[in-house]
């Protein structure tokens, strides 16, 4: 296991012990253990994860010529196994996992240990609350205090941007780049440059028509265009319906003339950054913001439902922050997202987090869309936050014994070691038949407390170090 700088055997034991305890915590809540492959085809992670993750993956070409990657996260692998039929049972399904993930992060090890859980087939606010509460309570159960949870909602922000007239494509772009706005004018300039490069700021030749269609209900626009076209579309449809063709045309049409809406959307996102705070306080500010931008109040219904459901759990000792400008680094999230933070962890290195990813199962080959929600914790970071009085061992550590003998008595030494192991002791055999001084030196280096020297007659002499 490749741990953080200055790692030690003690750190490894902590990570292993935490892993066992948290896994039992999840299992008591109905989450079954499932293992995934450490190596997957690269396109599994690229379909919906976004470029930010792609730039941090460890990828290579295998002997068959296929592009493969060390897993940078577990969720896509879990979903792949569900789509392929390996995860069986009625919905909703609850799964937990743990193991190494691999991501490039300057100044840190490229490998770290994760444990997490996925809830497949449940799309309610109660499902969101179960995952967020379980992530928080799992830390509390091993004695970690002082963490807070930052909560956002990709679906709500996306709908707010659509209310401003922004196309879906431009909205997705802006959602992914909200963190850049936190860096000030330099970040804003970079966003504009990228938007222009992707053709999001062009006025287009149909900007007047685009504006008119944006102001009309979708059903009326469809009828209007059908009236213009008449029967001229028959015979040229291929496998697509007229509704599908018109919908795609409208999507392209609404991408024109985005420059006038892009500036308004930028200002909205900048204001969202300043509204983060305790849920009740931030929610009141969001109502005022929505009114200022003529956004209907019911756009926030999913947030209200989530906090109502979260209220069923004991979260009074964990500060919550409602921050609609928060964005996780993976692009497949569609609803609630959250990060678990602690002031003792450096900026940019959260303890863990997760979110809702309702479109991922269909994107990875599922026959239909399925709601899903999950999270993961960084076990090394969790280990760094354990209280000083954390009880590492659930059971008393057995005594360590070095069993040594002359070469002619090796059979007796092996038999003695096997008897000790059967009784629960740690018994290591001296394969080099060391003399007393060398054996004592070796035992000290290995933190072994007792040496048992076995004679040919089977008699044992003990030496305590």
How does the language model describe each region?
Residues 38-68, 108:
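Polyanion/phosphate-binding surface patch
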Residues 56-64, 165-197, 342-344:
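Acidic, His- and aromatic-enriched active-site or binding-groove loops in soluble protein domains
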Residues 11-29, 40-41, 75-87, 94-145, ...:
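Positively charged, Gly/Ser-enriched RNA/tRNA-binding surfaces
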Residues 91-97, 172-175, 189-193, 321-324:
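Short coil/turn segments at secondary-structure boundaries
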Residues 2-9, 54-67, 115-118:
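Glycine-/proline-rich flexible loop or hinge segments
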Residues 32-38:
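A short beta-strand-loop structural module common to alpha/beta enzyme folds
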Residues 1-12, 188-191, 200:
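Auxiliary tRNA-acceptor-end handling modules of aminoacyl-tRNA synthetases
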Residues 111-115, 151-159:
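Short, conserved phosphate-binding/catalytic loop or strand-edge motifs used
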